Amino acid sequence: MGRIDYLHDPDAPLANSVVPSVVAFVRDGAGRVLMVQRSDNGRWALPGGGHDLGESIADTVVREVREETGIEVQVADLSGIYTDPGHVMRYDDGEARQQFSLCFRARPVGGVLRTSSETTQVRWVDPADLGGLDVHPTMRLRIDHAMDEGRATPHIG
């Protein structure tokens, strides 16, 4: 299913849903960041997805990272809450979703990199190389906040 992101765009569709979702900022022992290239829009992002009924939010993080990348993680902490009503995602099925995303830092504890139906590429990326990837500005904000380990409190916005 295709997706178009609108960010403070007057031509954006009106949102008709809000789905709690997560993304995971995962760094390996070399300090590289786990990134996925999404199959729905071709952009690079942190792995993540929607929260399912019956799950704790930490379980959602673990499941989504495993599903999209093959990597097993342990959730460390919350780096931010992202609820910008000016960020709307339109999907091919007519859904127009307002952003509602929790970003968690997580540690890899096992697994082997692989793609999924939601990812065309999965790789560990040196932080110095992140600027060369096509990353949506709201995802870049999450990455920047998660990389700032000196933040005393999570981002709320």
Predicted regions, residues:
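Nudix hydrolase/Nudix homology domain
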Residues: 42-43, 112-157
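Conserved Nudix-box catalytic region and its N-terminal flanking loop in Nudix hydrolases
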Residues: 28, 32-68
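Short connector loops at helix/strand junctions that flank enzyme active sites
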Residues: 19, 39-41, 46, 73, ...
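Active-site-adjacent beta-strand/loop module that shapes the phosphate/pyrophosphate-binding cleft
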Residues: 84-112
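A structural signal for short, well-ordered beta-strand segments
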Residues: 24, 78, 104-106
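Acidic, metal-coordinating catalytic segment for phosphate/diphosphate chemistry
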Residues: 1-23, 94
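A short coil-to-beta-strand element that immediately follows conserved catalytic motifs
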Residues: 72-82
